């Protein structure tokens, strides 16, 4: 059996499901926030009330993990770690998600590997926010929440908009050099 962790049955989930069915493989789509784990000598995952032995899982594909509290997010990642610790192959595993979901960590990894990115400055000190903006950016900079994707919460800070949406940023200010399209 293969598990597909997803928040919705989008095109990617449908394509994966069809591919598994083409090879006569059993597949279950799972909302990770509806999964539970049993940690004992007979460790299992519980999906929609059904206990599944980890020995019966051939692999798991992660297509989405919802936001939530720190505890909820950590638990969702713990489920993926749990599967891998029990020799279940997880595609788009917890380590990959941890490296890519946090813009600060991603920026640090890119920098450590000499992959060029726009100049970036991060602070949780509100006093440093405007100082950083005025010191390091001539005209405009991009202010982003450290979690999120697809441009959600992104703001251009410039002479006309000097204050970001503070509530959206949760007290961490990720400022990045604004690069014009060529």
Model-inferred region functions:
Residues 65, 125, 146:
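Flexible loop residues that form catalytic
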Residues 7-119:
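Conserved N-proximal alpha/beta basic substrate-recognition cap immediately N-terminal to
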Residues 119-122, 140-163:
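Glycine-rich phosphate-binding loop of ATP-grasp-fold ATP-dependent ligases
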Residues 61-63, 142, 174:
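Structural motif
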Residues 12-14, 129-130, 182:
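Short, well-ordered alpha-helical microsegments
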Residues 152-182:
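Phosphate-binding site of ATP-dependent enzymes
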